Amino acid sequence: MEQFNNFLILLDSFLSGSWWFPALLIGTGIFFTVYLGFPQFKYFTSAWKIVSGNYDKSESSGETTPFQALTTAMSGAVGTGNIGGVALAIWTGGPAAIFWMWITAIFGMTTKFVEVTLAHKYRTTIEDGSISGGPMYYIEQGLNMKWVAILFSLLMMITAIGSGNMPQINNIALVMNTEFAVPKLFTGLFLGGLLWIIIIGGIQRIASVASKIIPIMGIIYFGGALIILIENHQNVIPS
């Protein structure tokens, strides 16, 4: 385990400790932003209509509505990195870190736009009639690099088990144990069973649950941030 941790530390220093990695991420976003004519601004109205549910029609193709697809994507994006990561960035880099997060977010929108477009272009319908897609499909079909698609899939499975689940479940179990004396094992088993019930229902059940939970989570998230800003209003302008 110690050797594995040392490998992860080495890999992290290679990726996050070097200039080329953020330059590659931001550079990709800048390239597609210019190439596609600033789609994050050009299609802002359409994006707002999707969020508002204007395109949620039962006769539309696909297994989920656009709003359900959005909330499902957000359920996997908003979490440890967006909450703890932002706090760590501000603590480490100061208030100026917020500005650079805004910049990367603006160009990151275009990168996400391209990713989703490719996922739709190369998605396939499997035997049971359900739709399957994602980076592994457009890597294999678009780039004709099957081995990279397989490697990507394996790494994503490891990520889903590791950083995708363990830190969140561990933090919840720790809080429940510290504040309410609930055994960690009980919390883990309860959450595991709850997630199993949702996941076993496929993408439609996942999307249905996400579309109901994520808006509430968003309200709590922004409400908490607003309360913090109000309580520390004297530091807003100096920051």
Where are these regions (language model features)?
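Hydrophobic, membrane-embedded alpha-helices of multi-pass small-molecule transporters
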Residues: 21-32, 65-83, 148-169, 183-192, ...
